[in-house]
């Protein structure tokens, strides 16, 4: 599946980063859509920061370097890293490449039974690769690609579809 960049309006919010110290305030273009997906091709790095959203990163072309807790992770193409809310991290891209960056406000799930358990599972980072989690990797990768496809559609059923796919992603 080819990932198409969404219209500038929906993706431009990421370029208007609001940083206070190391805290990045995520602003969403669409008020009732607490999910932001960006197909990032920019070579610029993101210095040490944290935000109240979960962040899912998947390099699509070339790798991506993420540093958390003084440990550096070199993500390969199609490996998935889930960074929990509040986790200080730094992002360093290669000189060329493409990566999917998905920011999710986990309060989306607060009214669901089992949210507390889900939130506690997401209190630390999770690296999903063919080696680390072979039993779920293919499904998780497929779900992220479906989320990207739904996000690019931007029709009246995109948001409910994305929510359903995120529920699957976080409960595997």
What role is predicted for each listed range?
Residues 33-123, 154-160:
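N-terminal regulatory/effector-sensing and dimerization cores
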Residues 151-167, 171:
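All-alpha amphipathic helical-bundle segments outside canonical DNA-binding/catalytic cores
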């Amino acid at each position: 599946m080819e990932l198409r960049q969404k219209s500038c309006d929906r993706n431009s919010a990421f370029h208007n980063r609001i940083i206070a110290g190391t805290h990045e305030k995520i602003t969403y273009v669409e008020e009732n859509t607490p999910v932001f997906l960006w197909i990032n091709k920019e070579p610029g790095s993101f210095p040490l920061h944290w935000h109240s959203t979960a962040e899912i990163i998947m390099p699509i072309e070339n790798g991506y370097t993420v540093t958390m807790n003084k440990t550096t992770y070199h993500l390969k193409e199609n490996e998935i890293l889930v960074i929990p809310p509040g986790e200080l991290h730094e992002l360093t891209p290669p000189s060329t490449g493409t990566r999917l960056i998905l920011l999710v406000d986990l309060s989306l799930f607060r009214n669901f039974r089992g949210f507390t358990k889900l939130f506690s599972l997401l209190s630390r980072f999770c690296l999903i690769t063919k080696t680390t989690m072979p039993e779920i990797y293919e499904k998780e990768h497929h779900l992220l690609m479906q989320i990207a496809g739904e996000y690019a559609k931007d029709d009246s059923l995109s948001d409910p579809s994305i929510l359903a796919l995120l529920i699957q992603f976080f409960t595997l």
